[in-house]
Amino acid sequence: MGNIKQAFIKRTARELFDRYPDKFTRDFEHNKRMVQELTNVTSKTIRNRIAGYITRLVRMKEEGKIL
């Protein structure tokens, strides 16, 4: 069974994804760099979790599971 992501990670990821939809791709490494540029997150762990969730959102949007 997986872990549930914390609310502030989901909220931050959704805000970034809604605000800058063209800056994110299915590539985690690219998304990680974009999160670093667009936010002031200092923790590497939090940055990676946000980037991972954004990667998941991009994949779900491409598959038509979210609008």
Curated annotation (Swiss-Prot):
One Gene Ontology cellular component: cytosol
Q: Which Pfam families match?
A: Ribosomal_S17e (PF00833)
GO MF, one term, reads: structural constituent of ribosome
Q: Which Gene3D superfamilies match?
A: Ribosomal protein S17e-like
Q: Which InterPro entries match?
A: Ribosomal_eS17, Ribosomal_eS17_CS, Ribosomal_eS17_sf
Q: What GO biological process terms are annotated to this protein in UniProt?
A: translation
- Lineage, top-rank taxon, reads Archaea
Q: What keywords are assigned to this protein?
A: Ribonucleoprotein, Ribosomal protein
Family, similarity comment: Belongs to the eukaryotic ribosomal protein eS17 family.
Protein name, as recorded:
Small ribosomal subunit protein eS17
Q: Which organism is it from?
A: Thermococcus gammatolerans (strain DSM 15229 / JCM 11827 / EJ3)
Q: What is the lineage of its organism?
A: Archaea, Methanobacteriati, Methanobacteriota, Thermococci, Thermococcales
Q: Which gene encodes it?
A: rps17e
